[in-house]
UniProtKB/Swiss-Prot annotation:
One of its GO terms (biological process) is glutathione biosynthetic process. Keywords: ATP-binding, Glutathione biosynthesis, Ligase, Nucleotide-binding. It catalyses: L-cysteine + L-glutamate + ATP = gamma-L-glutamyl-L-cysteine + ADP + phosphate + H(+). One of its GO terms (molecular function) is metal ion binding. This is Glutamate--cysteine ligase. One of its GO terms (cellular component) is cytosol. It holds the Pfam family Glu_cys_ligase. Pathway: Sulfur metabolism; glutathione biosynthesis; glutathione from L-cysteine and L-glutamate: step 1/2. Belongs to the glutamate--cysteine ligase type 1 family. Type 1 subfamily. Its EC number is 6.3.2.2. The keyword Calcium does not apply. The keyword Nucleotide-binding applies. InterPro entries: Gln_synth/guanido_kin_cat_dom (IPR014746), Glu_cys_ligase (IPR007370), Glut_cys_ligase (IPR006334). It comes from Photorhabdus laumondii subsp. laumondii (strain DSM 15139 / CIP 105565 / TT01) (Photorhabdus luminescens subsp. laumondii).
Amino acid sequence: MIPDVSRALSWLEAHPTILKGIRRGVERETLRITSDGSLAITEHPKTLGAALTHKWITTDFAESLLEFITPAGDDIKYTISFLSDIHRHTARVLDKEKMWPLSMPCFIDAEENITLAQYGASNVGRYKTLYREGLKNRYGALMQTISGVHYNFSLPIEFWRAWVGVEDAESGKEQISNGYFRLIRNYYRFGWVIPYLFGASPAICSSFLRGRETSFLFERTEDGTCYLPYATSLRMSNLGYTNKSQSDLNITFNNLHTYIDGLKKAIHKPSDEFAKLGTKQGDKHIQLNTNVLQIENELYAPIRPKRVTRGNESPSDALLRGGVEYIEVRSLDINPFAAIGVNETQIRFLDLFLIWCVLAEAPEMGSDELDCCRKNWNRVILEGRKPGQMIGLGCGSVEEPLAKVGKKLFSDLKRVAAILDSCSGTQYQKVCEELIATFDDSSLTLSARVLEKMKSQGIGGFGLELADEYHQQLISEKYEVISDEQFAIERRASVERQDALEREDTMSFDEYLKQQTGC
């Protein structure tokens, strides 16, 4: 079944205050669109500041793919308000454009219409754009325009002091890192519950399949919407951002050093497939290098151990320096029923589940078990709502009904919820009551609700209706925690920071590239 966490929960019930101070941050991606739903081909609006250096508003793969970032904080309502204010501000300054409310893009006629994110003339800015050029040439631009929500989560030092006996984060970085890797292993084993509950991409526009081979047996509506009747998150399927060449990297999550060792090997491992592309076409650079990963961020993962980097530090060097500081959950689709793409219920569930993941026993995991876990995830991603769906337990032949495993998990989460609610309110317990019902009635899941709308309206109609509704809602709402003046200050500061980077460059881009890549 699932690990017995009763002793750990009893221990936590005796120490309820050690969970005070959980820190969270949210990152939300969204495409800028025109009034008819087409991808905006305009530059990143100058009224939003410089995407390279803005603290809260940047771009991801494409110039039209906005990314909103909240600072880390310990107040859920403040984080939601902060993210809402970023959306309100953006809606106010977009000129006749709106934000696409779904994970999967729709009205993109051709990949040539997708402009890579531009970050100015500095070497670091050009490097970021070249990395995206490499992604386009390796995997195609369309799949890089898929949007998601990332959730950053860290437990307070008081928890680690009580749980593993550390004195502080610096001296206890190895034990804390081991705790987060324990969380990650349990996430791989049981995190399929996230797409089951919150997957919101059960369908795609037929244009997304143009020129792409797929073994999926899609059903189609008259307007060209393609769907799988029991799917939860096609964003997380191999139609989305996956990398077949990464499947044999054997990166494991048993401890910090083996993880980093695997990651560093991957960024230096040559790829025959990508070598055929070369690094230049004439005088134009087309990728950073020909290795399996151009940089560490190219590694596809539903969860990542993270530490804030300093200067030009790589993510793995930051982890080596200070250990794991927080984890980044990358399995959330955009929630179409929330103007900001995510809601408080989802955040509170993730708190509960991630705490459970760190409490539950987590034996070391080899690459074979990791493959078994991925098959479980895939089963839920493609057929999670199928009546009687089974879920594998470990790598043997043992299977249990998904609903049974889900309910058992929630019996533990209810105890975690009571602990978190012990200081005030019943919000976490209400989340449990709401979500456990989905295991008896899958029509209550996000994917089922979304699919019903998409089948009746088409993806385009559904997305456009919501984009219009949310635009009007956002521009009519008042700011809650950030003022117009603060947005203006950060906009000017971001431009000044980018200008400074461009002035301070002392070497040519080719020299910079050689320094960064070693080749």
